[in-house]
């Protein structure tokens, strides 16, 4: 392999946020594996550490409540690191006992080491077992006072390189007649604008065509809406990124998703693409054409 294989092993107290952590690494482009058996790590690394492998970032959630694994972890990491092709980091997630008990009560789950349902006893036992591993870890994060968003932001801050895209904007258009996009964070209804559908020569075109785009944008309402929209969007985008959100989906809707919403999605994406990692898509742009062709 040309580049070293970077592996982050995620472990820590049960209930401290390992699920949020693995999702955060996935958002950073890591290949992720949840609940990797400790005795399979060496074999797993061997499968990845080949000349034709294109995966260079891996995050593993490992259950390390087995004392036997602690005796092997240092030798495993040392052996794999010494060959010069693997970088290891251990991330340990912790939280105070009070917070962990509260989280277990909230989810109504039993602690995996609890005896007769006594959560605190299970936490105490687990903390004792994991003490050496915590001392071995390069990064320790106390999640006691962190929301899932705060934890995500903390992980991005510690592990994302300056060149990685940790925040992406998806701009999309859609037609209300086909339903709202379920993954949209911000939805803007542009049905108040004049509809090119009623212009014969524009009916079969869409908002990516210059004639339709110009028709939509030449109206005073369009310009006023665009200016007010950008005044709102520009200052809130950094706030979304700061909160640790990995993807923000901005959706524009019109009746059929062919003309007005497409034109606005194109204009807004063009205005934002130089500063943000951005993708634009048009869910229903060709749906009418496909329906006509099938009939």
Swiss-Prot record:
InterPro entries per record: P-loop_NTPase, RapZ-like, RapZ-like_N, RapZ_C
Pfam families, per the entry: PapZ_C (PF22740), RapZ-like_N (PF03668)
Keywords: ATP-binding, GTP-binding, Nucleotide-binding
Keyword hit for Nucleotidyltransferase: no
A GO term for molecular function: ATP binding
Residue ranges that the Swiss-Prot or TrEMBL entry lists as coiled coil: none
Binding of ATP, residues: 12-19
Binding, GTP: 63-66
Gene3D superfamilies the UniProt entry points to: P-loop containing nucleotide triphosphate hydrolases
UniProt function note: Displays ATPase and GTPase activities.
Stored HAMAP family: RapZ_like (MF_00636)
Record-stated family: Belongs to the RapZ-like family.
This protein's name: Nucleotide-binding protein YjiE
Gene: yjiE
């Amino acid at each position: 392999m040309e580049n070293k294989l970077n592996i982050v092993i995620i472990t820590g107290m049960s209930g401290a946020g390992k699920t949020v952590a693995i999702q955060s690494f996935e958002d950073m482009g890591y290949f992720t594996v949840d609940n990797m058996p400790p005795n399979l790590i060496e074999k797993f690394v061997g499968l990845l550490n080949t000349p034709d492998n294109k995966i260079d970032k891996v995050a593993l959630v490992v259950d390390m409540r087995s004392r036997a694994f602690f005796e092997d972890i240092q030798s495993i990491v040392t052996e794999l690191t010494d060959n010069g092709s693997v970088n290891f980091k251990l991330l340990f997630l912790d939280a105070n006992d009070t917070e962990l008990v509260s989280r277990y009560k909230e989810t109504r789950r039993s602690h995996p080491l609890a005896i007769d349902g006594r959560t605190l006893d299970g936490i105490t036992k687990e903390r004792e077992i994991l003490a050496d591993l915590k001392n071995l870890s390069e990064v320790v994060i106390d999640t006691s006072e962190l929301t899932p968003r705060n934890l995500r932001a903390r992980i991005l801050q510690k592990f994302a390189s300056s060149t990685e895209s940790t925040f992406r904007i998806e701009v999309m258009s859609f037609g209300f007649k086909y339903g709202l996009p379920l993954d949209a964070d911000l939805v803007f209804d542009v049905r108040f604008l004049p509809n090119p559908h009623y212009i014969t020569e524009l009916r079969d075109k869409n908002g990516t065509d210059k004639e339709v785009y110009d028709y939509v944008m030449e109206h005073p309402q369009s310009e006023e809406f665009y200016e007010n929209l950008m005044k709102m969007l520009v200052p809130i985008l950094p706030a979304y990124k700061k909160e640790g959100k990995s993807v923000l989906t901005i959706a524009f809707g019109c009746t059929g998703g062919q003309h007005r919403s497409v034109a606005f999605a194109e204009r807004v994406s063009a205005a934002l693409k130089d500063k943000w990692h951005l993708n634009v898509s048009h869910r229903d742009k060709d749906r009418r054409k496909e329906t006509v062709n099938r009939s």
